[in-house]
Amino acid sequence: MLNRNFDLDIKSNYSLEKSNTFGLDIASESFFIVKNLKDLKNILSENKTKKITVLGGGSNILFTKFLDGLCLKIGLKGIDIIEEDKNNVVIKVMAGENWHDFVLWCVNKGFGGIENLSLIPGLVGAAPIQNIGAYGVELKDVFISCNTVNIKDQTEKEFDQKNCLFGYRTSRFKTIDKNIYIITSIKIRLTKEKHKYNISYGSVKQEIGNMEINLESISEAIIKIRKSKLPDTNILGNCGSFFKNPVINESKYFTLKKKFPSMPGFKIEKNKYKISAAWLIEFLKYKGRSIGNVGVYK
């Protein structure tokens, strides 16, 4: 039996169909929406022997069978400006906020730095776990710190940018501290003036065309590009784009480039080149290919 505090609204045998972007009707033994830190600590403390599954936007998970234990849906809400001067603003965002909605909030306020991360699915709390990034921008570029709760002993801990050990789509929360902490909020620093626009990707530059380059036009261009590549999860269940662009050494890059001249790629550091996973998928004719009930979108 699940240990429960009767003040907490814990659901039993709860369908996760509307809690994952594949829309799979898999049930969880127990389900609870976390709306404040007190409830989070209480429910963790009372269920130390249970398997805990932390669920955000449900876009990075594939349910295949009945989910044993307790599923915690992060519902912590709130956006607060905690520091501000003429040029910059520091914002604290709770983990349960929708990432894309938060990006649009920032764009509408004239705060720059994450407009390239428009329409990335999921919640704010998941953003540091894999250091989300797109079109030349990563979360670490604006990240200050995140607050966490330890699943085992319910202690709170803050990790600054350096201690998050960010890498290409990774962090300590995905490696050495996987399943140890629940991220409850993040702090980021954005610009109010003298924004540094990034339209280095050809598709973004092409989509903007002759429009004025600003926060709105970049965000709108990226939203349009993303929508053209991926189906609406309400129409066709999917997990979005999760492929990492392969990083290879210089020798390998030029060998492949000579053999496949159309292969896109660019230098990221000494002796390291990044090539396009999207190009590889299409070149190898996996775009639109299905095997059984699993497929790559056309």
For each predicted feature, which ranges?
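Anion-binding (especially nucleotide phosphate/pyrophosphate-binding) glycine-rich loop
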Residues: 1-152
